[in-house]
């Protein structure tokens, strides 16, 4: 191919390595619900699709509500998510205890549990494994991956991109996609 990834550091070493690893789709607005649910659903087969273990663990997502405000907000989110077709629900403190036996469900404790938003198909995944899996798949498709190579400038001629200046030299190109967090 004539595609290259130019990475200032190493694959997975930037913001990718500092995310929460929670795979979920519990957002309030319809556009966010749709894109995050699509993303979440892709994780169910991503290891097979990329032939790389993403270490996806569909253990569910539970957002505890410890104030009336949190409970109302999560209930609103739950309703919006259910209307969008997501598998989620509000659960009682007893159901929280059944799913997570170690939790303190004493109503007189400092932060009592009033309920929880529960998304059984949410989970966790290894962010580094995801980055490396995609990189390996890109490499197998012929994408050049250039690590430890800082882009220092984009050259233009007559308003059109003609190349990149990098810490490892010049790269001639007509198109540039910038992906940064």
Predicted regions and their residues:
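Glycine-rich FAD pyrophosphate-binding loop
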Residues: 1-17
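Short loop/edge segments at beta-strand edges and connector loops
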Residues: 7, 92, 147-149
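Dinucleotide-binding Rossmann-like beta1-alpha1 core, especially the glycine-rich loop
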Residues: 20-102
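Helical element adjacent to the flavin cofactor pocket in flavoenzyme catalytic cores
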Residues: 117-175, 179-180
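Hydrophobic anchor at the start of a short beta-strand
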Residues: 2-3, 88, 176
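Short beta-to-alpha linker loops that shape the active-site pocket of alpha/beta-hydrolase fold enzymes
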Residues: 9-11, 96, 134
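A short, glycine/Asx- and small/polar-enriched loop/turn
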Residues: 69, 99-113, 155-162
